[in-house]
Structure formats: structure tokens, C-alpha cells
From Swiss-Prot:
Belongs to the methyl-accepting chemotaxis (MCP) protein family. Residues 35-187 are annotated as: Ligand-binding domain. This is Methyl-accepting chemotaxis protein PcaY. Induction: Expression is induced by beta-ketoadipate, via the transcriptional activator PcaR. Disruption phenotype: Deletion mutant does not respond to vanillate and shows reduced responses to 4-HBA, benzoate, protocatechuate and vanillin. Its main location: membrane. Pfam families: HAMP, MCPsignal, TarH. One of its GO terms (biological process) is chemotaxis. The gene is pcaY. Keywords: Cell inner membrane, Cell membrane, Chemotaxis, Membrane, Methylation, Transducer, Transmembrane, Transmembrane helix. Residues 269-505 form the Methyl-accepting transducer domain. The chain crosses the membrane at residues 11-31, 190-210. It could not be ruled out that downstream intermediates are sensed by the chemoreceptor rather than the hydroaromatic compounds themselves. PROSITE patterns: CHEMOTAXIS_TRANSDUC_2 (PS50111), HAMP (PS50885).
Amino acid sequence: MLANLKIRTGMFWVLSLFSLTLLFSTASAWWAAVGSDQQITELDQTAHQSDRLNNALLMAIRSSANVSSGFIEQLGGHDESAGKRMALSVELNNKSQTLVDEFVENAREPALRVLATELQATFAEYAKAVAGQREATRQRSLEQYFKVNSDAGNAMGRLQTLRQQLVTTLSERGQQIMLESDRRLARAQLLSLCLLGMTVVLAVLCWAFIAQRVLHPLREAGGHFRRIASGDLSVPVQGQGNNEIGQLFHELQRMQQSQRDTLGQINNCARQLDAAASALNAVTEESANNLRQQGQELEQAATAVTEMTTAVEEVARNAITTSQTTSESNQLAAQSRRQVSENIDGTEAMTREIQTSSAHLQQLVGQVRDIGKVLEVIRSVSEQTNLLALNAAIEAARAGEAGRGFAVVADEVRTLAYRTQQSTQEIEQMIGSVQAGTEAAVASMQASTNRAQSTLDVTLASGQVLEGIYSAIGEINERNLVIASAAEEQAQVAREVDRNLLNIRELSNHSAAGAQQTSEASKALSGLVGEMTALVGRFKV
């Protein structure tokens, strides 16, 4: 069955199996990539949830702290500053409420959903307590302020507890996602090993098929071709089936038999040609006229050779002139190659300097970010100092006249904390501007690096082209020298041919007597040669 299998059919099945394996490998890789993308997206959402939670609580604390600062400033008679504090507290409260709502909306797991709902309810209580603080501040009611401040503290404690639980839940979910990713990776590795094994098996089967059904018959056919080319037709060609290889052997068998028949006919013609050649020696007298005509043509040929000698000498002179011009072009090409090499070195140095500057700017961006982190810590410390000053002022107010001096000191501390907070915000704005400018400079330096690299690539390509031109001009110069030398040799040969033609003309006159007998024998020989030509024409070269 395999002996009659078509080669194209076998190759079709081989390619089909490889295509199916490749398709299955691609599909499995696509499936793994989609799963990994989903896990990465879920992990990113988990990180965003943690950020929303922390930012919401931070803004809630800052909202309450601004109310406390506003209350102290209002007690001190700074109504305008207290109003700004109240407005900032409302803004921070709204932002934190938005973050909490987004956290609840994106909490999809049941356990996380329950904690998120509880967080939303507790945050509503805290927001209500902070609103009560703002109302007590507007009414200048110290008693009411202390009452709602206690409620806010209790609510904040519950919020901190819920935050810790939510952070733990989110962390566990992240670890679960990583475990699922590890399991997916293990499955992908096992599948890759299986596909590799299938590919190796298919490759071995394909090689066995090709070696047995294609290479071995082709080697055998090559042996037949070598024997036929050397004239050995004694080994018969055997068939190999009905496929393409079998058809090749059938045609080879036909060619062998055809050559045998042709060789037999050529042998018969050769015997007849031998008899005609024996009579040719006695009938050369008729060639005398042809020899006389040959003498005249030799005279014309001698004249033509003389003219050819003059033309060849002119070619030699032109070749020498061209060689000189090519040498000048070669010098110009060498100068251009040196200039391109210098340009390449300068462009490479400029690219390295731009890359070094880009690295320094990247370091500057990192240092600016570190300064921003330090400013965040300073701002947090100033807020805590403000709260401590507020508590100190409250305690001084309770102490009456005995705590007045302490109240003045607490007010000064609060003022310093407030100024520190404002200065920190201004520095953060300046740091943001510096960071934006630095990142723009980094992008510009990267663009310059890319343009410099493009220029370097173009210059390198130009250098390669000039190198090719330089090599081509050198080769042209060498060939021109060869042409000039060959033309000179041809001129000498032409002069020698002229002398030989004169000698041949003399010899042809002496051969006229024997040429007459050659004519009749040539007629018989022409018929035999025509028959042999027809037989040989059966072979296609």
C-alpha cells in the first residue's frame, strides 16, 4: 500500500499533521494567555481596592482634623480661616465617600461584599459624626463638639478594625490568584512537553517516510543515471510502484531501451560511413574550384584581419584611459569611506552621551519621588501636631486661668503646624512641577536617542554602500587592465593570423588538384551524416 502512495499525498498528510499540531499549540497558548490576562486584571483590581480603602480612611481622618482645626481657629476669632477649614472638611468627606462607594461597587466576592457593606454603614456613621462636629463648630458649642467628637472616635475605631479585616481578605485573595497562576503555569508546561513529544514523534515518522519512500528510490535512480551516462546499459531498470517515484523509474526504463535501439542503428550507419570514407580519398579533384574560391576569400579575410588589428589596438588604448579614470574614482570613493567612518564614530559617541544624560534624568526623577514621600511624612506629622495642639488647647480651656499660658503655647504650636502644612503643600506643588519637567526631559532625551540611532543606522548603510562602490570600482579597474592586456594580445594574434592566412592561401593552391575527387565522396557522406543526425536528434540534452 505504501509503495503506491503518492508523494504529494504523503507530504499532504505530513503537513496536515504538523499544521494540526501547530494549531493546537497556538490555541493552548492563546487560552493560557487569556487566563493569565484575567488573573492579572483581577490582581490589579484587588490592589486598586486596597488603595481606595486606605485613601478613603486617610481622607476621612483629614476631614475630622480640619474640623478640629477650624473649631480652634473659630474659638480664636479667625472666622475666615475656620470657614476654609470647614469647606476643606466637606470636600475631603465627599471624596472619601466616593472612594467608599467605589470600593463597595467593585467588591464582588460574598465575604468581601459583607465587610464592604458594613464598612459603608460605619462610614456613614462617621460622616454623620463629622457633620455634627462641623455643626457644633458653627454654633460655637464646646459641649456639643465633645459629644460628637467621642462618636467620631468610636466610629473611626470600627472603621480601622474593618479596614484591617478588608486588607486581610484582599491579601488572601491576591495569594489565591497567585496560586491559581502557578497551577495554570504547571498545566501549560505539561501541555508544552506533550506537544514537544508529539512533534518529535511526527518528525521521526516523517523522516522515516521520506527516507524509505523518497530518498532511497532517488539514490537507486541516481545509480541508474550514472551507469547510463558512463555507457553501461547491461543493468535493467525495475519498476517501483505507481506513484511519482514509480513513474520516474518507468520513464528511466523507456530511456534505457531507447538508447539501446539508437546505439544499434548508429553502429549500422558507422559501417556504411566507413565504406563511403574509403571512396572519398579517390574523388578529391572536384574540390579544386572550391579551393580557388577559398584562396580569394582568404585574401579578403586577410584584409579584414588587418582592419580588426587596428580596431583592437584602439580598444586597448581606450581601456587604458578608462583604467586611469577608474583609479581616480577609486581614490574619491576611499576618501568618502573615511569621511563616513568618522561620521559613524561621531554619531555613536553622541548616542552614548544622550543615553548617559537620559540615565541621569531617570535618577533625578527617582530622587524627586523620594522627596515627595518625605513631604508626605512631614505633612502627616504636621496634621498630628495640629491635633495634639487642639487637644492641648481643649485641656487648657478646661483648666481655666491656670492653663492660659499652656493654651497660648498650644495655639503657637498649632499655628506652626498649620504653616508647616501649607509650606509642605507648596513644596509638593513645586516638586510636582519639577517631576513633570524632568519626565518631559527624559522623553525628549529618549526621542533624541532614537533619532541619533536612526541617523547612525542610515550612516552605517551609507558606509556599506560606499564600501560596495569602492570594491566595484577596484574590480572595474582590474578588469580594464585585463581588457587592455587582452586587446594587446588579440592585436598580436591578429597579425599572426594575417601571416597564417597568406600561407594558407598558398597551400590551398597546391591542394586544388586533390579536391576534385573529394566532391563525390562528400555527397555520399552527407547522406549518411543526415541519417545519423536524425538518429542523434532523438536525444534531448
